[in-house]
């Protein structure tokens, strides 16, 4: 099965173009103001114009007021919501949009129980645990992922072109999600890194 690829944290037209040209399946926009990758819904609406049909638009939120999420959903065609804070299932389900729930993996976290708390989530996005919110570019121990996880698995956390092939072969996620691993600086993407990452995923797919 083809591993889906999401490039997250885009802020510039040329970076959206590069991700689409490389073959990304989804483009993620960060609507979390403290993040250096933050874009306003109005700015994202401009960037979305460069995304062709059948490439998903993902909106990432962290403990946001519901009205803010609704405003973003009205401003641009978000296909999937992604929640990275302390949101519960009732919160995540209220927007009538498919959603991913992020889990920050650490020893002691029961991922099966966590996934069971979000039965209507389209998938569980697994990231490394860091203090505060947002990705830290760290890889977590993939052996902490249980084989009986009752959700589609999206793998994130410290992925790069160098390690994503191993990740795809070992974890077999339905999708991989990358931000800092394809950056020149925070919020600015490196187009050669994007192309190399996508190529590494496709090569791994061919070997499975």
UniProtKB/Swiss-Prot annotation:
Pathway where it operates: Amino-acid biosynthesis; L-tryptophan biosynthesis; L-tryptophan from chorismate: step 3/5
InterPro entries: Aldolase_TIM, PRAI_dom, RibuloseP-bd_barrel, TrpF_fam
Matching CDD domains: PRAI (cd00405)
Signal peptide location: none
GO molecular function: phosphoribosylanthranilate isomerase activity
EC number: 5.3.1.24
Enzyme class of the recorded protein, top EC level: isomerase
Alphabetized UniProt keyword annotations: Amino-acid biosynthesis, Aromatic amino acid biosynthesis, Isomerase, Tryptophan biosynthesis
GO-annotated biological processes: L-tryptophan biosynthetic process
Record-linked Pfam families: PRAI
Reactions performed catalytically: N-(5-phospho-beta-D-ribosyl)anthranilate = 1-(2-carboxyphenylamino)-1-deoxy-D-ribulose 5-phosphate
Family of this protein: Belongs to the TrpF family.
Alphabetized PANTHER family for the sequence: N-(5'-PHOSPHORIBOSYL)ANTHRANILATE ISOMERASE (PTHR42894:SF1)
Protein name as it appears in the record: N-(5'-phosphoribosyl)anthranilate isomerase
Lineage, broadest ranks: Bacteria, Pseudomonadati, Pseudomonadota, Betaproteobacteria, Rhodocyclales
């Amino acid at each position: 099965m083809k591993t889906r690829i999401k490039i997250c944290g885009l802020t510039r037209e040329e970076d959206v173009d590069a991700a689409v040209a490389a073959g990304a399946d989804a483009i993620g926009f960060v609507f979390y103001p403290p993040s250096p990758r933050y874009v306003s819904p109005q700015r994202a609406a401009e960037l979305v114009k460069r995304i062709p049909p059948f490439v998903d638009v993902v909106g990432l939120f962290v403990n946001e007021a519901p009205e803010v999420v609704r405003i973003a959903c009205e401003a641009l065609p978000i296909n999937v919501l992604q929640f990275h804070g302390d949101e519960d299932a009732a919160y995540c389900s209220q927007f009538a949009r498919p959603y991913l729930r992020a889990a920050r993996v650490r020893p002691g976290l029961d991922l099966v129980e966590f996934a069971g708390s979000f039965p209507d989530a389209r998938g569980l996005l697994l990231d490394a645990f860091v203090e505060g919110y947002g990705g830290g570019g760290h890889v977590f121990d993939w052996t902490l992922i249980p084989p009986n996880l009752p959700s589609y698995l999206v793998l994130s956390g410290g992925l790069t072109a160098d390690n994503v092939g191993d990740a795809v072969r070992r974890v077999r996620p339905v999708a991989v999600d990358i931000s800092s691993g394809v950056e020149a600086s925070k919020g600015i993407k490196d187009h050669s890194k994007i192309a190399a990452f996508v190529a590494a995923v496709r090569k791994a797919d061919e070997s499975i």
